[in-house]
């Protein structure tokens, strides 16, 4: 009887476990890390773990003389390159600006080369050519044969440690070359330092100024075999007679016996605080010399993350989907040490904090889809860590982050994009109630600033082009989204007066609508709209928009689609304008921003302000058109090839759009908790939710030609709505979607079945 009761208890526990109903599958096999590494995708290729601080991978020669001035090497890697200079420990993924690529290590032999090689002239400096057939990239692992050195390089990583394994097939003057002056983009080393502790341990730092204006990277380096000799250099001159060197551009060659030890392993721990912490990170995360085990652990971490969604479909779609999901976990990266210490934006060290601090907040991009995706997939702890980091940044710099990079505020892009993320965490109950007041203080203080036109918004008026000669409309529309978020948060917290004020502010977008041309247009202080006016003009930083034109910004009102429809005079005119937008010529008239890519008509899937556009149709009763547009964007602009992303992945937002859309839904209004149905690409997807329940989406009649939703069932019952809410999703259960090659124009058409019935 006792044994029987025990078995019953055990079975009950297993029944509640997500793994009991959804056993772990081998999903890392479907990831192709090279997708998005060619052309404008700018994704990181190398070894890391989900959200890891260390992103260890190859750095190449940025071809700054091409038509994009080297733009396509922002991550440090581009698939079309045929050379590798060496391996660095920090990288950005999908960004439109380059930086990082810190702590360069070159596994070399022969003459010590002090400078990176020039393009197509590998003998002029360090680096090696390689063949694509000898390059392997998998989640948590990167491998390549460096032809010029005849060194097999294998890389893996933990959260804070890069783990190298080098097999030397040429032993002549074998050495590891460390270049602390190596830089990416306009970055520049401002101070550097290396100290030898013993024959297998070195510590140091690299301080630099670039996109991150005051970056500090401390490191500790340990080798598996003794270093027999060390040569230190300042720039290109050797420095003798010391085990400690300091200067603006310190370099070192660490020589070892490659005849006796053909294989050398290297661990590099990083810290923003100290070399002591960097050493401790190595001890905590990689206490043993076992590369195979470290590689397996990295793979297991990725596999566990990918299993949050079990997605069934054809092989190609599965590869695209899981690679997209993989890319959504490259940022925001961990930015603290194993002991909880981190460097704040105010350059003070915060010791032993009770949350995991993060950085690389590309918020103008990620507030739209990536953070809503994290809210569906990750437990409260991780999402709380994101918010607690933002609140700490607020306390340190006086406002919420805009684009936070390695302890630095870059103020890149427009608007106040942290506010929607913070507000959403409060509205959905993700943040602990004890933190609500600080969160509100941060939101309100940030929204009540004076910079970048906010002084006009505070007074409930438009930003005149007399005061802001470019991007005024972009700033204003993004402010309106943030103000809506503040309004909803104030309502949640019972702050009636604040709610009334921000309700007025989020509708200020209406003041930019020029009925004469049917677009949002910049206005002079005297009330006149900008003339002459060209709705297609998209020259970078020379119009009223940011990385777009008037056509593309006409739809950037996700917080108030009802109000936007009313500006056009109702559903009919709104749909007519939307149809024109998605079917007109894609010609931008020359000198357009490089960020405007992936065009269907003027709809630009390659840049974030249009990511919600396909799902607007459902608000006006023609959800079927949105299904067709979303399917077309997925089929044309997401492929399994190296150039398989039509634009910058933008720290995972481009990929997050695909993850949502391929499952057949998207959060058009990122904080409303409403997901609009589109056109699922799979046969079945099972999502493990933060509450450990599962939501299974089953698709009938899945085929490339079947873009349209014919009908939906929810837990076996007919479901006529073109949307589903966050609260409903968290209940788990099933959604059955039947697809068709012809549209069901009545599906989701009734006013009560449109998202507008509950959103706004």
Regions found by a protein language model. Give the residues of each.
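ATP-dependent phospho-/nucleotidyl transfer catalytic cores
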Residues: 482
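Extracellular attachment/recognition segments
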Residues: 708
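Accessory carbohydrate-recognition regions in carbohydrate-active enzymes
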Residues: 24-420, 424-477, 490-511, 517-518, ...
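Beta-strand-rich recognition domains
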Residues: 696-701
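Bacterial Sec-dependent N-terminal signal peptides
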Residues: 1-25
């Amino acid at each position: 009887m006792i044994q029987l009761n025990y078995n019953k208890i055990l079975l009950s526990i297993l029944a509640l476990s997500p793994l009991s109903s959804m056993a772990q599958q081998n999903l890392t096999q479907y990831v192709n890390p090279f997708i998005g590494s060619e052309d404008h995708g700018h994704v990181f290729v190398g070894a890391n773990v989900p959200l890891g601080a260390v992103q260890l991978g190859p750095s190449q020669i940025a071809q700054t003389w091409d038509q994009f001035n080297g733009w396509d090497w922002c991550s440090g890697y581009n698939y079309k390159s045929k050379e590798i200079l060496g391996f660095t420990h920090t990288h950005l993924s999908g960004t439109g600006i380059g930086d990082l690529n810190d702590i360069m290590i070159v596994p070399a032999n022969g003459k010590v080369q002090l400078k990176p090689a020039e393009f197509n002239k590998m003998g002029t400096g360090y680096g090696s050519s390689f063949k694509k057939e000898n390059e392997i990239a998998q989640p948590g692992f990167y491998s390549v044969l460096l032809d010029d050195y005849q060194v097999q390089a294998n890389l893996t990583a933990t959260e804070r440690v890069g783990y190298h394994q080098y097999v030397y097939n040429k032993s002549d003057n074998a050495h590891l070359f460390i270049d602390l002056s190596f830089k990416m983009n306009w970055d520049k080393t401002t101070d550097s330092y290396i100290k030898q502790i013993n024959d297998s341990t070195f510590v140091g730092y690299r301080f630099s100024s670039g996109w991150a204006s005051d970056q500090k990277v401390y490191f500790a380096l340990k080798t598996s075999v003794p270093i027999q000799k060390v040569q230190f250099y300042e720039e290109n001159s050797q420095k003798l007679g010391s085990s400690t060197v300091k200067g603006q551009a310190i370099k070192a060659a660490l020589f070892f016996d490659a005849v006796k030890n053909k294989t050398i392993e290297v661990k590099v721990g990083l810290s923003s605080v100290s070399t002591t912490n960097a050493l401790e990170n190595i001890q905590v995360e990689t206490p043993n010399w076992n590369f195979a085990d470290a590689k397996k652990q990295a793979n297991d971490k990725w596999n566990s993350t990918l299993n949050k969604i079990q997605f069934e479909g054809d092989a190609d779609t599965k590869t695209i989907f899981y690679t997209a999901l993989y890319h959504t976990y490259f940022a925001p990266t961990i930015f603290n040490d194993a002991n909880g210490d981190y460097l704040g934006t105010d350059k003070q060290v915060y010791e032993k904090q009770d949350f995991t601090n993060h950085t690389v907040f590309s918020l103008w991009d990620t507030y739209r889809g990536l953070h809503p995706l994290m809210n569906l997939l990750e437990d409260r702890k991780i999402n709380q860590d994101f918010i607690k980091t933002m609140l700490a940044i607020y306390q340190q710099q006086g406002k919420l982050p805009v684009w936070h990079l390695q302890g630095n505020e870059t103020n890149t892009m427009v608007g106040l994009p942290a506010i929607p993320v913070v507000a959403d965490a409060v509205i959905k109950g993700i943040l602990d109630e004890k933190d609500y007041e600080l969160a509100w203080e941060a939101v309100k203080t940030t929204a009540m600033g004076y910079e970048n036109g906010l002084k006009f918004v505070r007074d409930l008026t438009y930003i005149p082009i007399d005061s802001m000669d470019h991007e005024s409309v972009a700033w204003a529309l993004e402010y309106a989204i943030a103000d809506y978020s503040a309004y909803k948060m104030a309502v949640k917290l019972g702050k009636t007066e604040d709610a009334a004020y921000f309700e007025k502010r989020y509708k200020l977008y209406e003041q930019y609508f020029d009925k004469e041309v049917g677009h949002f247009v910049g206005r002079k202080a005297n009330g006149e709209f900008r003339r002459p006016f060209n709705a297609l003009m998209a020259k970078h930083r020379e119009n009223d928009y940011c990385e777009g034109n008037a056509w593309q910004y006409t739809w950037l009102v996700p917080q108030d689609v009802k109000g936007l429809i009313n500006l056009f005079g109702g559903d009919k005119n709104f749909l007519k304008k939307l149809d024109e937008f998605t079917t007109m010529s894609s010609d931008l008239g020359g000198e357009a921003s490089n960020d405007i890519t992936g065009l269907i008509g003027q709809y630009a899937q390659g840049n974030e302000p249009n990511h919600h556009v396909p799902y607007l149709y459902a608000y006006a009763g023609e959800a079927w058109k949105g299904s067709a547009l979303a399917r077309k964007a997925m089929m044309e602009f997401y492929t399994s090839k190296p150039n398989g992303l039509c634009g910058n992945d933008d720290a995972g937002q481009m990929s997050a759009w695909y993850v949502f859309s391929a499952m057949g839904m998207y959060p058009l209004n990122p904080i409303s908790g409403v997901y609009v149905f589109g056109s699922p690409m799979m046969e079945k997807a099972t999502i493990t939710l933060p509450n450990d329940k599962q939501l299974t989406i089953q698709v009938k009649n899945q085929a490339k030609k079947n873009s349209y939703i014919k009908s939906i069932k929810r837990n076996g019952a007919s479901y006529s709505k073109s949307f589903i809410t966050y609260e409903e999703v968290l209940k788990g259960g099933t959604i059955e979607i039947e697809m068709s090659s012809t549209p069901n124009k009545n599906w989701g058409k009734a006013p009560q079945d449109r998202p507008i019935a509950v959103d706004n």
